[in-house]
């Protein structure tokens, strides 16, 4: 099974080698058919502490690194 890749915005870089990325998804409400926005935060591994708050990044699924980290940052979007 291929690894999932998500795109989001870094909302916190206070932890050592970890960033918190907010990923937003949009979908049509099943009854109202209005576009709804929902977001979720993922902790992602940042080996060199190179990503800062506000950066748009891609994160990829990986083996568990800690209790909460199962994602790693692969690239920043231009």
UniProtKB/Swiss-Prot annotation:
The keyword Cell cycle does not apply. Keywords: Ribonucleoprotein, Ribosomal protein, RNA-binding, rRNA-binding. Belongs to the universal ribosomal protein uS17 family. GO terms for biological process: translation. Coiled coil: none annotated. InterPro entries: NA-bd_OB-fold, Ribosomal_uS17, Ribosomal_uS17_bact/chlr. GO terms for cellular component: cytosolic small ribosomal subunit. The lineage of its organism: Bacteria, Pseudomonadati, Pseudomonadota, Alphaproteobacteria, Hyphomicrobiales. This is Small ribosomal subunit protein uS17. It comes from Agrobacterium fabrum (strain C58 / ATCC 33970). Part of the 30S ribosomal subunit.
């Amino acid at each position: 099974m291929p690894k999932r890749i998500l795109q989001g915005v870094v909302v916190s870089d206070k932890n050592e080698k970890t960033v918190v990325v907010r990923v937003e998804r949009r979908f049509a409400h099943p009854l109202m058919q209005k576009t709804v926005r929902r977001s979720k935060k993922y902790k992602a591994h940042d080996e060199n502490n190179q990503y800062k708050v506000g950066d748009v990044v891609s994160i990829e699924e990986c083996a568990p690194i800690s209790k909460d980290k199962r994602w790693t940052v692969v690239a920043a979007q231009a």
